[in-house]
Amino acid sequence: MIDTNPITNNHTFALTCSFFDDTHETELSTIIGENNILAFKRGNSILTTRWNLDELVLWLRDFIDTMAEDPYPVEADGEYAAIKDINARDFDSDDEDKFDAYYDRLDDWNLRHRWHPASCGAVLADLYFQLVGNEVEISWNNEDAEEGVEFLNIVGGVKVKKENFYNVVDAFLKAYALHWFN
C-alpha cells in the first residue's frame, strides 16, 4: 500500500485514494464538504469503496473528456439528477411502445451520467454527474443499497465549479493510471 493521496481544489469537493498492490484494489473516498459520500456501514464498521476500479476510472475519463450539457431526458421534479431519476421512475403507460421508449431514454441518459454501471461489483454509492452551465452537479441516490450495506448519505446533491471538478477528477485519474497502468 502507498500513502493516501488527497486530491482537492477546495473544501467543496475532493477525492482521496489509497492503492493496495497485493490485491490491485483502490480505496476511494469522494468528499463533499466534510462528508465522504461513498461511506457505508456494514455490520459495526464504517467503510468506503475498496475494489479494482479500472472500469470506473475508464468511465470517469470518458465523462470528463466528453462533458457537455445534456439535460435530464424527461420532465421530472427535483433539483438534481438523482432526485429527478427517483421521481421519473413512476411513469406508466398501457402503450408498450411509449413505455419502452420512455425508459430507454432514461436508461441511455443514465449510462452517460451515472457511474454505478461501471462499478464491476464494488460497493459503490450511486452517483450521478451532470454538467449544467459552468457547474457539475454531483448527486446521489443510495436508497437501494445491497443487503447488509447502509450508506451514510442516502440522497443529496451539490454543485461544483466545472474547472474544479475537472481538475480534481483528472488528477485522480492520472494518479490511478500512473500507479496501475504503467
In which residue ranges do the predicted regions lie?
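Preference for intrinsically disordered or flexible, low-complexity segments
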Residues: 1-182
